[in-house]
Amino acid sequence: MSERLVTSNEIGIDSTNEYSLRPEKINEYIGQDKVKERLNIFIKAAQRRGEALDHVILYGPPGLGKTTLANIIANEMGGNLKITSGPAIERAGDLAAILTTLNTNDVLFIDEIHRLNRSVEEILYPAMEDYVLDIIIGKGAASKSIRLDLPKFTLIGATTRIGMLSSPLRDRFGVLCSMEYYTDEQLKEIIIRSAEILGCHITEEGAFEIAKRSRGTPRIANRLLKRVRDFAEVLYDNEITEEAAKKSLEILEVDGEGFDRIDNKILEAIIDNFNGGPVGIETLAYFVGEELDTIEDVYEPYLLQKGFIVRTPRGRMATDKAYKHLGRVRFNESKIDSKQCTLFEK
C-alpha cells in the first residue's frame, strides 16, 4: 500500500468526510476527560468576564484530536478558526498577514508550533501579551516602527514535542494541556458515532474490533472504519459485524494489536535473526529494509509503548510479549520484563 493505514500522521484518506466526523461542541467530544473538564471551566469563565480565552498549548502524539479541540474552542467562544502550521510561517511578514485578519474571539491554531523560527516568535510575544503588532517599515536609518492594535484573540499551539518549544514562547501560554492515548472503549464510542454519520450500520462488537486495532488514536480509528466500510458494502450487506471487521482488517494486514506488516517485520528480525536481541538500530533498519529515522520515529515508539521491545545500552531487545505475539518460544535465559527494564534513549 502506498500509505500506511496505522500511522498517526495525517494521510490522504483522512480528508474524506474529515470535518463531518468532528464534534462541534465540547460536550460532544469523546475522551480526554481531564483536558475537556479544564477547558470547559476556562471557556465559561472567559465568557462571563467578556474576555478572550487565554492562549492554549495542546501537546501529545499526533492524531489525538488537537485540531478538533481548537475548532470546538472557536465554536464555544463564538469566533472563527484560522489554521496554519509552524513550517508554513517562514517570515515575520507571513505571521503579520495572518494576525491582521483576525477578529475578536477568533482562534489562531498553529500546528507544529515548535517549528516556528525565532524571528517569527518575536512577533508573537507582544501579540500574545498585549494584543499588539509591531511592524518595522523601511530599512536602515529611515526605518520606523509602527504599532497596530489587534483584536482579543486566542492562540492555540499544537506540538508533539513540547520540549522543543523555547522557554519565552512556552511561558506565554496560560493553559497547557497534555493529550493522552484513548482507551479501546472511548475509541469504540468514536467509531459508533462516526459510523452513524457515514450512514453505515455497525455492531458494538464490530466497533470494538476496529477500536482495539487503532493504536489509541481516533484518527486511525476513523481511517480503519472507512476502509472496513468499503468491505462491508461489497461483501457483508453493508453491516460491520465483529467477523466482518476481523476479516477486513486481516486483508488490510492490520493485526489484533494494531500492528502492520512492518511492525511485525521488526519483531521478527529481532527474534529470528538476533535471538531476541540486543541489536543496534542501524543493523535492525538494514534487516527490515527501512530508513533508520523511519524506524525510530514511526515504528519504534508504539512498539516501546506497548511493551513489545525495550531499549538497552546494547540495543533493542524483544520482550516475552513479542515472542507470544509471534507464537515464538524463547530458548535462551535472557528473559526481559518490559515493566522493569529501563528505557534508554539511544
From Swiss-Prot:
Region Large ATPase domain (RuvB-L), residue ranges: 1-182
Entry binding sites for Mg(2+): T67
Record-level Gene Ontology MF annotations: ATP binding; ATP hydrolysis activity; four-way junction DNA binding; four-way junction helicase activity
Enzyme Commission numbers on file: 3.6.4.-
UniProt binding sites for ATP: L21, R22, G63, K66, T67, T68, E129, D130, Y131, R172, Y182, R219
Localisation per UniProt entry: Cytoplasm
Chief site of localization: cytoplasm
Alphabetized SMART domains for the sequence: AAA (SM00382)
Spans annotated as Head domain (RuvB-H): 256-346
UniProt-annotated stretches for the region Small ATPAse domain (RuvB-S): 183-253
UniProt catalytic activity: ATP + H2O = ADP + phosphate + H(+)
GO cellular component annotations of the record: cytoplasm; Holliday junction resolvase complex
Pfam families, alphabetized: AAA_lid_4, RuvB_C, RuvB_N
Alphabetic keyword roster: ATP-binding, Cytoplasm, DNA damage, DNA recombination, DNA repair, DNA-binding, Hydrolase, Nucleotide-binding
Superkingdom, taxonomy of origin: Bacteria
Gene Ontology BP annotations: DNA recombination; DNA repair
Binding site residues for DNA: R311, R316
Family stated for the protein in its record: Belongs to the RuvB family.
This protein's domain notes: Has 3 domains, the large (RuvB-L) and small ATPase (RuvB-S) domains and the C-terminal head (RuvB-H) domain. The head domain binds DNA, while the ATPase domains jointly bind ATP, ADP or are empty depending on the state of the subunit in the translocation cycle. During a single DNA translocation step the structure of each domain remains the same, but their relative positions change.
NCBIfam families named among the record's database cross-references: PRK00080.1, ruvB
Subunit and interaction comment: Homohexamer. Forms an RuvA(8)-RuvB(12)-Holliday junction (HJ) complex. HJ DNA is sandwiched between 2 RuvA tetramers; dsDNA enters through RuvA and exits via RuvB. An RuvB hexamer assembles on each DNA strand where it exits the tetramer. Each RuvB hexamer is contacted by two RuvA subunits (via domain III) on 2 adjacent RuvB subunits; this complex drives branch migration. In the full resolvosome a probable DNA-RuvA(4)-RuvB(12)-RuvC(2) complex forms which resolves the HJ.
PANTHER family (alphabetical): HOLLIDAY JUNCTION BRANCH MIGRATION COMPLEX SUBUNIT RUVB, PTHR42848
Function: The RuvA-RuvB-RuvC complex processes Holliday junction (HJ) DNA during genetic recombination and DNA repair, while the RuvA-RuvB complex plays an important role in the rescue of blocked DNA replication forks via replication fork reversal (RFR). RuvA specifically binds to HJ cruciform DNA, conferring on it an open structure. The RuvB hexamer acts as an ATP-dependent pump, pulling dsDNA into and through the RuvAB complex. RuvB forms 2 homohexamers on either side of HJ DNA bound by 1 or 2 RuvA tetramers; 4 subunits per hexamer contact DNA at a time.
HAMAP family from the UniProt entry: DNA_HJ_migration_RuvB (MF_00016)
Protein name: Holliday junction branch migration complex subunit RuvB
Species of the source: Clostridium perfringens (strain SM101 / Type A)
